[in-house]
Amino acid sequence: MDPNCSCPTGGSCTCAGSCKCKECRCTSCKKSCCSCCPGGCARCAQGCVCKGASDKCSCCA
């Protein structure tokens, strides 16, 4: 389960604008789900992997 969300790891969720999901795929938020993703990344909602705040996430590299 995602520590920042109520959905299972790898699952899909529909979070509010303050989405902080890291282990699941948020399908509703327009903001970055990973802290290292740029806010305008259109592919973040498809799921991304973040190794650290200063790293680039896998979907927006």
Swiss-Prot record:
Record: residues binding a divalent metal cation 1: 5, 7, 21, 24
Any one GO cellular component localisation term in the record: nucleus
Binding positions for a divalent metal cation 5 per the UniProt entry: 34, 36-37, 50
UniProt-recorded Gene Ontology molecular function terms: metal ion binding; zinc ion binding
Listed GO biological process terms: cellular response to cadmium ion; cellular response to copper ion; cellular response to zinc ion; detoxification of copper ion; intracellular zinc ion homeostasis; negative regulation of growth
Region span, Beta: 1-29
Residues given in the record as a divalent metal cation 2 binding sites: 7, 13, 15, 26
Protein purpose: Metallothioneins have a high content of cysteine residues that bind various heavy metals; these proteins are transcriptionally regulated by both heavy metals and glucocorticoids.
Entry's family note: Belongs to the metallothionein superfamily. Type 1 family.
Domain writeup: Class I metallothioneins contain 2 metal-binding domains: four divalent ions are chelated within cluster A of the alpha domain and are coordinated via cysteinyl thiolate bridges to 11 cysteine ligands. Cluster B, the corresponding region within the beta domain, can ligate three divalent ions to 9 cysteines.
Protein's name according to its UniProt entry: Metallothionein-1A
Organism name: Equus caballus (Horse)
